[in-house]
């Protein structure tokens, strides 16, 4: 659609999406608010300017924008505006994936996200598959990957791929959606954390503690506080050290991971001499 420029400020404001955005200020005339946007802000109301069906038909993304404003600001969507959003929700299928993703990630990180998702589930589901049971995502950190994982469940990665989300968000969402409970045993718990790496283990522990209270975050924090090695970058040896032992190719990574898991489990100390001694034993066993 082409954009026509108008000189009349009121005519311009009449084309805005919501009354809260249809306010202007003139140094000579002061506040220009023909649609009572200031009153709606005061009362916490999201209301379409004029005919809601017309506004949403002009750009269906406005439907998600209404939900996003309600989520972020904690506002209520005015009944007629909400009704039009439900009736025209299928128009969202024609909106580009990138624009939809941009709105959804802001919506999911809003202070009232859980309430908005529950109320307007049918609208969101047009472009984003939702799990049967959605947890209170407002208890999670403001992390789009975590929140998409929580609301989409096993479909998180596919949903984000369809929305053309960035690879990092897709990968992290898949990690959260597919994460399993941490082992109860201390040794197994340490190894599981090391397999994930410190950063991922800390994030997953927070995620699981919110959705399935396990006290995993406290356990991870204790390991970190006590200096337990949970990632290769904190291991006292590196690839060059292992290469010096005659190891080549993928075997270098295998040996390093073996040392990492042993150090995390407490089987050996994270000291260069001890690790190299253990590495030599591992290398000798591989040669036999």
What do these predicted ranges mean?
Residues 1-288:
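Catalytic cores of the polymerase beta-like nucleotidyltransferase superfamily
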């Amino acid at each position: 659609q082409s954009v026509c420029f108008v000189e009349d400020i009121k005519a311009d404001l009449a084309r805005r999406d919501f009354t809260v955005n249809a306010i202007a200020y003139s140094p000579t005339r002061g506040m220009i608010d023909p649609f009572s946007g200031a009153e709606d802000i005061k009362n916490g109301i999201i209301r379409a300017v004029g005919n809601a069906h017309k506004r949403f038909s002009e750009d269906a993304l406005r439907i998600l924008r209404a939900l996003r404003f309600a989520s972020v600001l904690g506002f209520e969507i005015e009944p007629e505006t909400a009704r039009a959003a439900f009736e025209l929700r299928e128009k969202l299928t024609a909106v580009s994936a990138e624009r939809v993703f941009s709105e959804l990630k802001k919506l999911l990180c809003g202070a009232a996200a859980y309430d908005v998702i529950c109320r307007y589930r049918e609208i969101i589901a047009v472009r984003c598959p939702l799990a049967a049971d959605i947890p209170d995502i407002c208890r999670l950190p403001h992390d789009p990957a975590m929140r998409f994982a929580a609301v989409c469940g096993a479909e998180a990665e596919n949903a984000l791929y369809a929305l053309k989300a960035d690879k990092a968000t897709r990968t992290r969402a898949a990690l959260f959606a597919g994460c399993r409970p941490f082992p109860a045993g201390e040794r197994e718990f340490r190894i599981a954390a090391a397999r994930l790496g410190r950063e991922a283990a800390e994030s997953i522990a927070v995620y699981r503690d919110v959705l399935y209270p396990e006290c995993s975050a406290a356990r991870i924090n204790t390991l970190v506080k006590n200096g337990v090695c949970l990632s290769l970058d904190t291991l006292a040896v590196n690839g060059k050290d292992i290469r010096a032992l005659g190891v080549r190719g993928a075997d270098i990574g295998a040996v390093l991971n073996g040392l990492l898991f042993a150090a995390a489990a407490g089987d050996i100390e994270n000291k260069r001499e001890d690790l190299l001694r253990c590495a030599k034993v591992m290398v000798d066993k591989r040669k036999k």
